[in-house]
Structures are given as C-alpha cells and as structure tokens.
C-alpha cells in the first residue's frame, strides 16, 4: 500500500528550489531579481506552504499508527565500507517536520513586513529558505553521517544570518563567535560519530544500539569507550542548543534580524541539538552515567540561563537567555528519560518563543522611528514602557507568550513543563527543585520584561538618534507582521491541550522507544501543578511589586548586590573565556612570534652569517695571484714541519 511518507523527500526540496532560484537570480540577474522581490518572496512562501501541507499529512498518518518508513540508497560501496543516504520517517520526524515548517512559514510572512525596506530583502529570503531546508534535511536523516552533513549546513546558514548586517562590527563579531563556539561541539560530534563507526562498523542508529549492547556483554572496556564516544556526540547538542559551558554564542546571535532570531530560537538551530539527543536516546539510555551527565548539564544550564535573564536590559538578549534556560529544561528531561515530556516542551516552547520573539521584533520596529536604528536604543527596555496602549496586538501577543512560557494554565507550556517537573520529582528531588526554582525565576524575568516594555508610561520620547526630545509614539505594525502574531497566539493557547495528562494524545511518540504509558495520578498532578503554578504566580507578583508598584529598581539591586552583579555580568563566564581563550591565545601568539623572531630566525640568520664569513674568508684567499698561492704553500709546509718536529720530539 502506498504511503504518504514516501514523498517526504520533497519536503526539503521545495524550499531548496526557492533558495537556489533566488541565488541564481542574485548572481546572474541582480537588478531584475531585486525589482521582482515581492514575487520571489511569494514564491518562497508558497513553496514552503507545500512542504507544510506534506508535513501535516505525514503527521496525521503517523498519529493513525502508520508504520515508520525508510528509503535508503547505497551511495558508496567498497569491500570494507558502506555509505547509505536516504530519508527516514517516524513519529519524531513527523512532529519535527510540522514544527519547523509551521514556524518557518510564519516567520517568512512576518519577514515580508519586517524587512520590506531592507536592501538585502531578497538575499535574506534566500538564506531563510536554505536554513529551513537544512533543518528539514537534518530531521529526515536516517543515519549519523547524513545528520552531520545537514548539521554543518545549519551552522553555516546561522553564520550567514547572524552576520546578515555584516557592516555592523557587532554583527560580524557575533557570527564569528557563534561559528567558532559551535566548531568545538561539532568537532566532538564528528569524533563521536567516527568512534561509534569504529566500534560498530555502522552509522545507522538501530545497528549502533544493537551492537553496543552486544559489545557491553563481553568487555567492560567497551562500555567505557562507548560512554566516551557518547559524550563526544553530546558535545554537538551542548554547543548547538546553547548548553553550559558552550552557551556564550546565543545572546550575541541577537545581532541578526529579529525574524532569524525567532527561527533560530524556536524551530531550527537550537532545536537541532535536542532532536539529536532524542534520536540518540535509545543509545544514550544504555549508559546511566551518560544520562546523568545529560540531565545535570541541562539542569545547570536552566538555572544559569534563568538567573542571567533577570537583569538583562536588552529585550532580545533577555529572550535569548530565556531560550537557553528552556533548552536546559528539555535536555534535563532527556537525561531523566522523559523522552515524550522533553519533545512536548520542545513543541510548546517553539510556538511560544516564536510568538515572543516576533512580538519583540514588532516592538523594536515600532521603536525605530522614535529612538533610531541603533540596537542599543531600540532594544533597550528602559526606553520603552506603556507600549501596549499604542500597539495592542503586539502587547497582547507578548502577554500570551509570557503567560504560556511561565506555565500558567491552561496555556501550552504549562502542560509540558508540568510533565517535566512531574518526572523530575520521581527521578531526583534535587533536579525537581532546580526545575521548580527555575520556573519561579522564569515567571519573574518574563513579567519583568512585560512590565518594562508594555505597562506604565512610555519613556522612549526622551531620547532619539539625534539626542533631541521627540514627541513621537509607537504605532502598531502592519498586517503582514501582526497576522503571524495572531496565529502563534492561538498555537500558544491551544497546542498544549494535545498533551494534557488526563487525555494525552502526544503519547504516540512513546512507542518509538518502547516505553510504557504510566497511569494518570490526580493527586500527583495537583501537587506538582499546584507547586509550579504557585511559584510562577510568586515570580509574577514579585516583578509587579518591583517594576509597577514600587518602581524602585535600584533598591532591589542594592538589596541583592552580590547576586545582581553575578547575574548582570553573566556569571563572569564571558569574561573568563575572554581572559583564557581570547587574551590567552593572543599572548600565546605573541610569545610564539617572539620565539620565532629570536630563536628560529636567529638560528637561520646565524647560519647565514657563518656562511657569509667563511665565504668571504675563502674569497680573500682565492684571489688569482700566484705569489699568494706560493706564500700559502710555504706557510702550510712550515706549519706541517713544525707540527711534525714537535710530535717526534715528544716521542723521543
């Protein structure tokens, strides 16, 4: 029987075709391509719309228990090496396809309004389309090697998009920082993939899992080696999903245009790391030590990201640290074995965070005519305030996203966060406490952002680009920007209902890894949900007291000065990296240069000097005068006779 899954290969092909078409147009017919910019954007959106329809059909087929589908082509076949490429569709793939395509198409529609007057409008659409293609290809990959290829393509596209405004020094530095930081994780990922191939002779997930089980039965050394290779693979998600200690690139990535910030943080780059851990879950779950390492990496990242977010002044960077914290939740859940809860939170967070970032972009777009185009001003929350009165759609959308991310029922993230905390309570009370505390901090910093930006009195007319007082006020964004906000608002309200614990339709993912569905316990649910909602409300009320009622933020900062300084300086992690890696490498380079000049060059120059002196000496002897030669012969003979006479006198 024919399955819709066999057409899954078309899903990344459509956006790839659009990206290539624009690329060829920009190279060969730049002027005509820029004139037809609106038609190109419509074409890209239409092509991605076809991919979205196919993704939804595949998801529905998987929900209806359609078997997983795999198509493999043997690309390289030798006596001792086999490389296969193709595509693989299972429930995890189906969910990720829908998340990526829905968020991507809404971001593209939003971009049409946000970037309409940017000179790089067409180029940006080409990059976005290629970025989406790379993530879709990664999701469909049937083996580790193919995942690595698309993994690198995702990294390349992020480099291009973060540095899209490359004339800005900050953007140029940010894309380099993201690229270099991710190289650390990618190098570990590559070594881990090659290590597992060396152990098992395969890049296929199921083959690796089966052979590792067999090897572990014979030799404990194989187990330790497998844990090490698993750790190397985990370095890839640590970097890509901005986990501690390779998280430092993510806030700087905010130098790119806001639509790409939404796509990176919601459905593509950072989601790739969680997806890889999910795909490797049957392998990682064989090693308890590795699972504990994953869980604690996520927990530490969650609390660090949350504590840094509470003092951010830049709106987009505050949301960036929020993403870091929520990704920590997902990785922690994977490490605890909460496969479904982690992926459920990935889905709910994707829509809520896309809503928050696009709302932030709409706010920044409204601030630009007042304070100018400098990100230090139009993203500065201290220059905002009361914007909901002037931009009601944007303000209400941001409020819904905030309520969802804080875990307020019945919005989307409440159900997924509650599922993670419920599993954490059973797995480890300490992990539960970290997750519970992070939930309170999440509520505090999110409502802090909301109150600073959308409530109170507008503070932006006190400064503009020319430092002259302005009486302008923000205006609501155009329909192309507000329509995606409305759609994402609906998703942020309703998408979590498919995973409620008393009617969980999301549990079909469980069958991928053969886990049993635990019965619903109303008492446990009320305790976990009540405690998480309680701490969230406490965080919200604390933010209200400080930023709305009292409005004396200095008193709050002085009261908790050590913690405030630690948070404001981002735990000094960037400073430590600057001192060790940047300044350290610079000092090492200077010392190497000095060694090269004084020692290496000195040795080479000394050799040349010796050659020069000896050649000059020989040249003075070989002067062509016969009397000089006779004199030299006589002198040599006399010297030999003198030595001989001395020798014989000593003997006698």
Curated annotation (Swiss-Prot):
Record's bilayer topology term: Multi-pass membrane protein
GO BP annotations listed: ATP synthesis coupled electron transport; electron transport coupled proton transport
Listed GO MF terms: NADH dehydrogenase (ubiquinone) activity; quinone binding
Keyword Chloroplast in record: yes
Transmembrane region(s): 9-29, 40-60, 91-111, 124-144, 147-167, 188-208, 225-245, 258-278, 289-309, 327-347, 354-374, 395-415, 424-444, 482-502, 526-546, 630-650
Quaternary structure, from the entry: NDH is composed of at least 16 different subunits, 5 of which are encoded in the nucleus.
Family: Belongs to the complex I subunit 5 family.
Protein name: NAD(P)H-quinone oxidoreductase subunit 5, chloroplastic
UniProt lineage: Eukaryota, Viridiplantae, Streptophyta, Mesostigmatophyceae, Mesostigmatales
Originating gene: ndhF
């Amino acid at each position: 029987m024919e399955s819709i899954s066999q057409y899954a290969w078309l899903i990344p092909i459509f956006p790839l075709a659009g990206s290539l078409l624009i690329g060829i147009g920009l190279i060969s017919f730049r002027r005509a391509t820029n004139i037809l910019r609106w038609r190109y954007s419509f074409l890209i959106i239409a092509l991605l719309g076809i991919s979205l329809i196919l993704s939804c059909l595949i998801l529905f087929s998987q929900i209806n228990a359609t078997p997983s589908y795999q198509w493999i082509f043997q690309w390289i076949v030798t006596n001792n090496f086999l490389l296969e490429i193709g595509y693989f569709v299972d429930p995890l793939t189906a969910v990720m396809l829908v998340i990526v395509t829905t968020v991507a198409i809404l971001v593209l529609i939003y971009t049409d309004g946000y970037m309409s007057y940017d000179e790089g409008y067409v180029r940006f659409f080409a990059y976005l389309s290629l970025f989406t293609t790379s993530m879709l290809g990664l999701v469909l990959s049937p083996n580790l090697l193919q995942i690595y290829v698309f993994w690198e393509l995702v990294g390349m596209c992020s480099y291009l998009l973060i540095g899209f405004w490359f004339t800005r020094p900050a953007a140029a530095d940010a894309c380099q920082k993201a690229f270099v930081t991710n190289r650390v994780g990618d190098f570990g990922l590559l070594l881990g993939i090659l290590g597992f191939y060396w152990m098992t002779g395969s890049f296929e997930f199921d083959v690796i899992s089966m052979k590792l089980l067999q090897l572990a039965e014979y030799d404990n050394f194989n187990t330790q080696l497998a844990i090490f290779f698993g750790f190397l693979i985990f370095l890839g998600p640590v970097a890509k999903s901005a986990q501690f200690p390779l998280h430092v690139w993510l806030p700087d990535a905010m130098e790119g245009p806001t639509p790409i910030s939404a796509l990176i943080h919601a459905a593509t780059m950072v989601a790739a790391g969680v997806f890889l851990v999910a795909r490797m879950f049957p392998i990682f779950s064989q090693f308890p030590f590795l699972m504990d390492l994953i869980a604690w990496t996520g927990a530490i990242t969650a609390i660090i990201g949350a504590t840094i977010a509470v003092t951010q002044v830049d709106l987009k960077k505050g949301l960036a640290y929020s993403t870091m914290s929520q990704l920590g939740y997902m990785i922690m859940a994977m490490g605890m074995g909460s496969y479904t809860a982690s992926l459920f939170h990935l889905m709910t967070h994707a829509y809520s965070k896309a809503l928050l970032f696009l709302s932030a972009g709409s706010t920044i777009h409204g601030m630009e005519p007042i304070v100018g185009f400098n990100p230090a001003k139009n993203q500065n929350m201290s220059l905002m305030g009361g914007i909901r009165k002037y931009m009601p759609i944007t303000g209400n959308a941001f409020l819904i996203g905030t309520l969802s991310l804080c875990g307020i029922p019945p919005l989307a993230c409440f159900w997924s966060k509650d599922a993670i905390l419920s599993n954490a309570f059973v797995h480890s009370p300490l992990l539960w406490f970290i997750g519970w505390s992070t939930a309170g901090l999440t509520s505090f910093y999110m409502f802090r952002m909301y109150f600073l930006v959308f409530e109170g009195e507008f503070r932006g007319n006190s400064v503009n680009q020319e430092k002259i007082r302005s009486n302008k006020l923000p205006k609501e964004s155009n329909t192309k920007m507000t329509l995606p906000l409305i759609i994402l608002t609906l998703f942020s309200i309703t998408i979590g209902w498919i995973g409620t614990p008393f009617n969980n339709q999301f549990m079909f993912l469980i069958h991928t890894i053969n886990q049993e569905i635990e019965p619903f316990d109303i008492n446990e649910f009320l305790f976990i949900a009540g405690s998480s909602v309680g701490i969230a409300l406490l965080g919200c009320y604390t933010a209200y007291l400080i930023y709305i009622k009292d409005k004396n933020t200095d008193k709050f900062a002085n009261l908790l000065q050590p913690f405030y300084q630690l948070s404001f300086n981002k735990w000094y992690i960037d400073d430590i990296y600057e001192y060790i890696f940047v300044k350290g490498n610079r000092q090492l380079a200077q010392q190497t240069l000095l060694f090269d000049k004084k020692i290496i060059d000195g040795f080479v120059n000394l050799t040349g000097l010796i050659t020069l002196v000896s050649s000059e000496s020989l040249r003075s002897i070989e002067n062509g005068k016969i009397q000089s030669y006779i004199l030299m012969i006589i002198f040599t003979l006399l010297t030999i006779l003198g030595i001989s006479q001395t020798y014989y006198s000593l003997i006698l």
